[in-house]
Each structure stands twice: as C-alpha cells, then as structure tokens.
Amino acid sequence: MDNRIKMSGKKRPNTRAVKQQLFLNCGRVDMYSMEEYAKCKLELHHDPPFRYSHHTIYEESYLLSADSHRELHYLEQHNIDEYNYRMEIIRENKRILERKRG
C-alpha cells in the first residue's frame, strides 16, 4: 500500500498535506529518529534541507520517478561523470518542454 500524497500534474503538495502525511507515516517525531522523518519528508516533498546530497536540480524532480531520483542520488555520490551526463539530458529536456509550452 502506497501512503504517498498523490501529486496531480506538476503542483507540489501543500505544507499541511505534507505534515499530515508525515504524521501518518512517521508518527510523532520524538518517537522516531530524525533520519527516518527526514527520509520520509524527502520522499513526500523535495525540500533541499532534507536531501542527503547536494543534488541541485530539484525543481524538475517532479518529472522523475522515485527510482530515477534514487539512482541520480547514487550516481551523484559514486559516478559524477554519469551523473553530470544525465543531469545535462534532464536540463535539455526541461528546455524543450519550456519551448513547447511557451
């Protein structure tokens, strides 16, 4: 069963919805480690302070699947050349989308 907030389109969930879902997933924060809370928050709402790495392009993270996002974080830490190559592809795809919309 997937307890994540359903994201329609590209709009990020609002803070209240994220807090409610965090409470359902993690319970009271003082009952759990902050690491578990931060990991859950990262999955629900891509906020930079809760990231494990300096993954910089988070504004298009809604375009990526959860698996792709995890793989990018892994590549950022272990294979920076492949990470840079993939991020350049993501940037180029974003530019193409913006041109089509605009």
Label for each model-derived stretch:
Residues 1-34, 53-55:
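Short, charged surface segments at domain edges that flank catalytic/cofactor-binding sites
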Residues 8, 21, 39, 92-93, ...:
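Compositionally biased, intrinsically disordered low-complexity segments
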Residues 31-63, 72, 76, 83:
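Histidine-centered nuclease catalytic patch
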Residues 58-60, 66-102:
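A detector for short metal-coordination/catalytic motifs
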